[in-house]
Amino acid sequence: MPITLDPEKLAIVMKHRFQYKICRECGARNPPDAVKCRRCRSKNLRPKKFKKK
């Protein structure tokens, strides 16, 4: 089922797939508003990389 046909479903998928932060030290996924990593407590976080096609 292609999701590209329905913009609402596409927005939901994009939010869940790309709106989070990655810890640069341990690689854990964190919520988008995180300041510290949930696993190693590092403050070295980056947003998830996203490429548009």
UniProtKB/Swiss-Prot annotation:
Keywords: Ribonucleoprotein, Ribosomal protein
SMART domains (UniProt xref): Ribosomal_L40e
Record-linked Pfam families: Ribosomal_L40e
Signal sequence region: none
InterPro entries: Ribosomal_eL40_arc (IPR023657), Ribosomal_eL40_dom (IPR001975), Ribosomal_eL40_sf (IPR038587), Ribosomal_zn-bd (IPR011332)
Entry GO terms, CC: ribonucleoprotein complex; ribosome
GO biological process terms on file: translation
GO MF assignments: structural constituent of ribosome
SUPFAM superfamilies registered for this protein in UniProt: Zn-binding ribosomal proteins
Stored NCBIfam families: PRK04136.1
Family: Belongs to the eukaryotic ribosomal protein eL40 family.
Protein name: Large ribosomal subunit protein eL40
Organism: Pyrobaculum neutrophilum (strain DSM 2338 / JCM 9278 / NBRC 100436 / V24Sta) (Thermoproteus neutrophilus)
Source organism phylogeny: Archaea, Thermoproteota, Thermoprotei, Thermoproteales, Thermoproteaceae
